């Protein structure tokens, strides 16, 4: 039992660190780089920004890939922690988070395509510069749609994980309950937004996932520095042995 507790404690710290690391990475990549280079409604200016700061643009892509890798580590750590509570639900959450991670791979490929369109390669000379800029902007804009498709699955994954955290008592139940509510809110808002794009005029897009983001930051700090509630784990394991 001691070995099991030590293993869960280690994976909890991995999950906590990865929560915080992935959050910081995605903020740097998107708010610090991509949003800085992307000019809304202006394909020509966006193209000039990218080509003038190609290295920075590539760093943003690298950050996206690091974020994607972090998501894989996170889903594995959470699966190990939550599997003793309910293996099927833990697997479902891991699958949904994997789908979300794959959408980031698609977004990275779109960014590489945009960069290739602006590269000035010889085989692109048959196209007008404005057309290439518009196509590059189109591929970059597609990332917006891909993100919200992925966010639906991420919200579902977080909802399931939060429920299992609530059921397990690994973290304070009030925090886990907030996670369930904020994650379900994110998934619901995203689903409605996909069907009704004007929904963003009623609820700002930032409010879709901001509450869930707050939950993940707090949970990350809790798991990294506070760890799991080990007495509850020991009690559950003892009860399991008595039933056998």
List the predicted regions and their residue ranges.
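Hydrophobic, aromatic-enriched alpha-helical segments typical of multi-pass transmembrane helices
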Residues: 1-244
